[in-house]
């Protein structure tokens, strides 16, 4: 199953479609991996979160790949309108599995080429 890897770098965010997601299975939020897995040779990326096929966000303090209903007072998965409000919301565990369709990452160390050059983004604007 194809999934999306969102790579954030300072002010710019790029989205990469990856066909083979098996290489990222088992990574936990906070783990670093080689960007060559997603086509960014020379880059080191850090997993910061993600979402599963039903849109439930990954939460760092929920171990494993399971989906639970957690009582939240704010933070990832729930943003109350007033202070002190708690609500039970469904969140996903912190480990990447087959059900995850979006993985959010941040650049830890950059490669020699810019991400836009590797992906070919921005070429359409220059041609027009």
From Swiss-Prot:
Keywords: Ribonucleoprotein, Ribosomal protein. Belongs to the eukaryotic ribosomal protein eS6 family. The keyword Membrane does not apply. This is Small ribosomal subunit protein eS6. GO terms for cellular component: ribonucleoprotein complex; ribosome. NCBIfam families: PRK04290.1-3. The keyword Cell cycle does not apply. Pfam families: Ribosomal_S6e (PF01092). Coiled coil: none annotated. It comes from the Archaea. One of its GO terms (biological process) is translation. The gene is rps6e. One of its GO terms (molecular function) is structural constituent of ribosome.
